[in-house]
């Protein structure tokens, strides 16, 4: 009798320990990250890592700022953990305050929007509209790479052309292909998941076709040059 009770208690104890450990790892894996300052360092990928080893974050785009940045609300686990049907993403700016991550697209540079009293560059609006149409109020998967000097998360960004399907596309090459952005040339550039060489090849084609910003010919001022004058 005592032996039976002992075994029963041992089984219950083992079950509680296993559940506790499982719960700890579950909460750790699916913990929501509210802003860039709370992103763990081990979330940041080396851009040379193999595709299958990328650490990614799944979330929802709440606002598009310009042609190469947006606000990202982290929804770990997506619909499987109830997001958008049991758990709602806040809508108002006050509710979203300090709850979203500012994301800068890795590997590309879009025309500059108007700020600091300076006019926007040609095709800045078109670049923003393209990004808005692809990402706004949609779920995306990002590949975190680094935090830049403006406290933005620089990341590769993959969107879903067909909502709720697993097939996804890297947004950066789409913008390069249409002439709505150029390849980022700064020494601090990071490229993921599409490599710099592939982006440069797409840029050459867009330039030859004189698409969008490349239609300006010799009047073109690269975003990096324009920013230095701000």
Swiss-Prot record:
It is found in: Mitochondrion; Membrane. The active site is at 104, 112, 152. The chain crosses the membrane at residues 10-27. Coiled coil: none annotated. Belongs to the LCL3 family. It is a single-pass membrane protein. This is Probable endonuclease C19F8.04c. InterPro entries: SNase_OB-fold_sf, Staphylococal_nuclease_OB-fold. Residues 55-216 form the TNase-like domain. One of its GO terms (cellular component) is mitochondrion. It comes from the Eukaryota. The keyword Ligase does not apply. GO terms for molecular function: endonuclease activity; metal ion binding; nuclease activity. Its EC number is 3.1.-.-. Pfam families: SNase (PF00565). SMART domains: SNc. Ca(2+) binds at residue 109. Keywords: Calcium, Endonuclease, Hydrolase, Membrane, Metal-binding, Mitochondrion, Nuclease, Transmembrane, Transmembrane helix.
């Amino acid at each position: 009798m005592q032996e039976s009770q002992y075994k029963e208690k041992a089984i219950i104890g083992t079950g509680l320990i296993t559940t506790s450990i499982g719960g700890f790892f579950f909460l750790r894996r699916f913990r929501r990250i509210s802003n860039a300052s709370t992103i763990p360092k081990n979330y940041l990928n080396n851009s040379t890592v193999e595709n299958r080893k990328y650490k990614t974050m799944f979330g929802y785009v709440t606002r598009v700022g310009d042609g190469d940045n947006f606000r990202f609300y982290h929804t770990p686990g997506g619909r499987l953990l109830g997001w958008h049907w049991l758990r709602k993403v806040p809508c108002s700016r006050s509710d979203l305050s300090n709850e979203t991550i500012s994301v800068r697209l890795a590997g590309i540079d879009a025309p500059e929007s108007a700020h600091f009293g300076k006019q926007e560059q040609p095709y800045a609006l078109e670049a923003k509209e393209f990004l808005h149409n692809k990402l706004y109020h949609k779920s995306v998967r990002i590949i975190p790479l680094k935090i830049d000097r403006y406290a933005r998360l620089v990341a590769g960004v993959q969107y879903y052309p067909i909502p709720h399907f697993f097939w996804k596309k890297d947004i950066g090459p789409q913008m390069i292909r249409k002439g709505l952005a150029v390849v980022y040339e700064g020494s601090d550039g990071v490229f993921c998941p599409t490599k710099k060489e592939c982006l440069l090849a797409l840029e050459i084609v867009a330039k030859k076709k004189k698409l969008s910003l490349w239609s300006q010919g010799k009047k073109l001022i690269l975003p990096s040059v324009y920013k230095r004058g701000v």
